Amino acid sequence: MMSKLGVLLITCLLLFPLTAVPLDGDQPADQPAERLQDDISSENHPFFDPVKRCCRLLCLSCNPCCG
């Protein structure tokens, strides 16, 4: 009886391996790098000066401010 259960278990594992089970690893919360790419940073702001690495005008939505 136990050998039949063992054969059934091995057969099931061969037909349906655990790697075939879909994991939730593709959820956005598990991929912080992609979330950071979607973030709008000050460097993309139209008033950002890349030479001085600060914002020239209207520093309300852009940091750091050149002053």
From Swiss-Prot:
Propeptide residue span(s): 21-53
Modified residues (4-hydroxyproline): 64
Cell location: Secreted
Keyword Calcium set for record: no
Tissue expression remark: Expressed by the venom duct.
Molecular function as annotated in GO: ion channel inhibitor activity; toxin activity
GO CC annotation: extracellular region
Name of a matching Pfam family: Conotoxin
Disulfide bridge map: 54-66, 55-62, 59-65
Record's protein name: Conotoxin TxMMSK-01
